[in-house]
Amino acid sequence: MAAAAFPFCAAQEVTRSAQIPGLRPYKVDLEYMPRAEKDSVRMVAELWRGYVESFTSSSVDEARRRSFWVDGSPDYLQEFDDGNLLYASFRENRILDIRKLGGGTYELIAATFSKLPGEEYDNWVEAVLRVCVKAVASGNGGKNNPFRLCNWLDAEFPSLTKTIFKGIEYYCVPGCGVPKKAASGLATFVTRFINEYAPEFQGPLRYVVAPSVDQCERLSGILFNAYSNPLMSSASGKNSDRMFYGRTFGTDIVLSNYWDDRHDVALLLIKSSWPKALPMIQEGIAAYHGGYMDLSYSDIKASLRRYLASKKDLDLSNDDNFYDLSIPVSGKDGVTVAVVPLEGIIGAAIVEYTIVQQGRSKVKNLLGCQNYSDIFKVLGIPSADINDFIRGIL
């Protein structure tokens, strides 16, 4: 792990040896650590453990869960993977190490291990995660834990170079500059998209850029991820040299290795303005207007057409039949660039049909749908005709 890439590394006070009582072993030397430091390390560990356990407790509501974070900020790690890596019942979360970064700030590294039966799953590491922990006012007469969590990306912001361009705040790793042409094109796209779908968006839009997929993963706090499929990994599967990373965090941050990741910018703006909309429609709007990495919507649509032509028995009248499927997407050269969830591409085709046949204002009616069948009620499509309708609009 290069110190240049991670500015906190040089300031870390690394301690090693004994186990903290009641927790999994990790290398923090309690024997020689000052009493105040011991207490701080214990509280950091207790905070993380309590937060993880809150996902299996029916008595913990969302407000309580947000209280574990600085200023109640979004849990970026949960946003990153829908919580599956951290909190699923067939996974175990363990603390690997806690390091003091300086002041009241700590780095906590945790890992998820499989709990599936069978020798092949013994000590199988699925992911290694890093979060930042900061001391805040404890409240309640000092009885509350004074530490709060924040995503590692929050910890990295001070080390990134900030450039403001027409309402977009770019944050770049050292040695990485903003191409004016790309920034100008994205700014125009953002302005038009906000006017169309998210006029209440207050901004600013924070756009974090790192040149490689590996750097993006590390900025996000994901140090290791065993999976390679787009539903469970930190980046979509791909087999070309066009390596791509794009994620949205909270309501105002995009992290990407592309300067003009219009798909994820559109997705962020839609999620921030229409948080209760169906993911299919959110993703569909993002794909229709923003494409996917350097692929246009027409490339994505052509890939969907080819896929469905080879899957004539796939019944599209019920989203349970395809919500967990992904398909290869390629450009005009026929080279597969990525493996993309089918749900969002079907959503994009529905969005296109709605705009062309019924007008842009009708798309906002789609954003208000509560379930898959509601989409077709808005469009006036009988339930018996859904499968033929989707195949027909391609």
Q: Each PLM stretch: what is its role?
A:
Residues 37-45, 175, 179-187, 254-263, ...:
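Solvent-exposed, acidic/flexible segments
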Residues 275-394:
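Acidic/His/Gly-enriched intrinsically disordered linker/tail segments
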Residues 40, 62, 265, 333-334:
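Coil residues (strongly favoring Ser/Thr
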Residues 160-278, 295:
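Juxtacatalytic substrate-recognition/specificity segment
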